[in-house]
Amino acid sequence: VTAATSKHSFDILIGPATGLDPIRRQLGATQPKSSVLGRTLAKPALHAGFAPSASRDFANPVKIAIIAHLKYPIAQPFSGGLEMHTHFLASALRARGHHVTLFASEGSQADLGLVAVCAPTGSAFDEASSARIDLLEAHAYDRIMDAVAKGGFDIVHNNSLHPLPLLRAREVAAPMVTALHTPPFEPFVQGVVARAHDMTFAAVSKSLAEEWCTVLPRPLVIGNGIDLEAFAFNAQPAGLPHAIWTGRIVPEKGPHLAIDAARAAGLPLVFAGPQSDPVYWDSMIAPRLGADVTYLGHLSHADLARRVGEAHVTLCSPRWEEPFGLVVAESIACGTPVAAFGRGAIPDILDASCGVLARADDVADLGRAVSEAVGLERLACRRRAEHLFDANVMTDRYETLYRAEMRHAAPTVLHARALGEA
């Protein structure tokens, strides 16, 4: 199911991300959701329709297991885009009446149907911590899969980025859908390869699907959505002209390059996010702080949206192929134009109405992009976000996929009741 076959539009594509004659249909947030979807896979082709709210496809609530990754809690303030995505999806599905159980780490939001399986495992910075985390996560995902196998679920949504749920999926009667949020990495790839022939995988952008095509020839694409009410439109920036950068403060996000680019453009910069890599902070960020560069801390969702909406421009400086670009989507939803390195999915999000792209890792070119982006029309930014990133549409698409997977799974009375067929 995809996002963007061109720089200027997002498509829904169910079928190979690359290959012959994929069935495509433009599905913007403002377009009637009546398209027919089809795909070619080893198992029977999926044919499903989008209703104004796809939850109407279910006669009764569905019992859904969501397997989160365990490194950080699924709670505000979010450590990153995956935590926010998992939180919103669980919340939205529960709001639609489904019975959601979220398997996640301690500290996650309790009213999401939480089953807390371990303390947050965090990120590794050396071989010893990596080995410790690997062991903790393996034991935790074993416990999760034991519970899922006994839980009587209709569908399992796997957001874990861990191979073990994939390798044990055959032990579960319910079908599993696995979302791809990152480029291929070991050992997750081992699990994906093991189930590539008989499981549905959905990447969060077309560019990410293309990266996975080397090991997974037919990934679907379901683009991420954002809460357009939380990231509300702000027609006028606040205060003196300034830029903002948000995200995890880690080398692959490149905040040190954003600082240098803002200075090159002559704009003060404020930035926010968790200090996820102390060594990187001490060596590359702390020495760059000054009167024109201010660290705001790790902000709540509401405070983050307010500060983004007040800014004159957002910088996005990834040093990897950005799988989706959630920061970009949130910024334009607030009406704040974006200057960004043209990496990964970002060129699929930004067009000339809402952002300016720069050459990857080129600080001077990013400074140029900052100067040009400041003058873009804020309402055009918001309209672009509304067209591409309505989270309710994302939820519709996942519901439609769940329904199709349940239809093609081994029939059970529980599935039939949920679909209104018993």
Question: Positions of the model-derived regions?
Answer:
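N-terminal, intrinsically disordered, basic low-complexity segments enriched in Arg/Pro/Ser/Thr
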Residues: 8-17
